[in-house]
Regions:
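Membrane-proximal interfacial segments on either side of biological membranes
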Residues: 1-115, 120-286
């Protein structure tokens, strides 16, 4: 790691601190990332070498400028919730720039350059550490094309996700009764996309979802369509039970070819309720 500090010194000043002007810092280096972000069987992660460079200018002012670059070409990364997987063979360089302002909102812009991903967004941090994400665009030109907005404050996260395509094929209901530690107290998500990819590489349309998560408690309401056919899915999970409800006039359009529903249902319609006991993990299906 290389760090350079530069400043100007006013000669013959009686106040040494006040005599120091135009304080700037420049740093360049690399670090080995090896982060696993959850205890899911298929966890989110980032692995590999990240090259970085950044500069911080006007350190003594009320408007500190920061800009830099993160080169993630030599990393692998995975976000399970939207099945976004970056391979080491893919280029991803992120530029960031912005200003720290004393007693005011600080705004930073993040964008990809010379990359296999299109990423562009704005992050704002208030003087009370309230974080806002504004129109954060993510497009990997394959299975993810989304715009994310939201905020995080006092361990409450709100996210609004819209776009042309979201991939939910790696989202699976895990059955376990392990105790977990939660950083967030409440998570609120609203999702609206033109298309969605379900498990089995099934692509359907008009996906909508509302998700409320309060630590171990979860509430999900979602829907999708394929031509004139409809699917509704809901889930209510608390400390005692985990209830899943699936309703469709033709479920075969929403599941993969290997799914049991394609073999077991005579008329393809379904209205299924599963209630699982979270203590013994036994389920009743009706």
């Amino acid at each position: 790691q290389d760090i350079t500090l530069s400043f100007e010194l006013v000669p013959n000043s009686e106040n040494v601190i006040e005599s120091i002007k135009n304080v700037n810092v420049y740093s360049k280096g690399k670090f080995d990332s090896n982060y696993i972000f959850d205890d899911n069987k298929n966890p989110n992660y980032i692995i590999g070498i990240i090259d970085y460079q950044f500069s911080i200018e006007n350190l003594k002012s009320k408007n500190i400028s920061i800009k830099g670059e993160l080169n993630l070409d030599n990393t692998e990364a995975f976000i399970r919730q939207i099945n976004l997987k970056k391979k080491k063979s893919e280029k991803l360089i992120l530029d960031f720039s912005g200003n720290f302002k004393n007693l005011e909102d600080s705004v930073f812009v993040i964008k990809s350059v010379d990359s296999d991903y299109d990423i562009l967004g704005e992050v704002k941090i208030s003087n009370t550490n309230h974080i806002f994400v504004n129109d954060f665009e993510i497009d990997n030109k394959k299975n993810v094309d989304l715009v994310i907005s939201g905020d995080l404050s006092e361990r409450v996260l709100n996210l609004d996700i819209v776009g042309s395509l979201i991939d939910l094929s790696k989202n699976k209901v895990e059955v376990n009764n392990k105790k977990k530690t939660y950083y967030l107290d409440t998570e609120n998500y609203t999702i609206r996309t033109d298309n969605v990819i379900f498990n089995g590489n099934v692509k359907v349309d008009n996906f909508k979802a509302g998700i409320i998560k309060k630590k171990s408690k979860l509430s999900v309401q979602s829907s999708a369509t394929f031509n004139d056919h409809k699917l509704r899915y809901s889930r209510e999970k608390d400390n005692a039970t985990d209830t899943n409800v699936i309703i469709s006039d033709d479920i075969t359009h929403f599941v993969g070819d290997s799914h049991a529903a394609k073999k077991l249902l005579s008329d393809d319609s379904i209205e299924l309720t599963s209630i699982r006991n979270n203590d013994n993990l036994k389920a009743e299906v009706s």
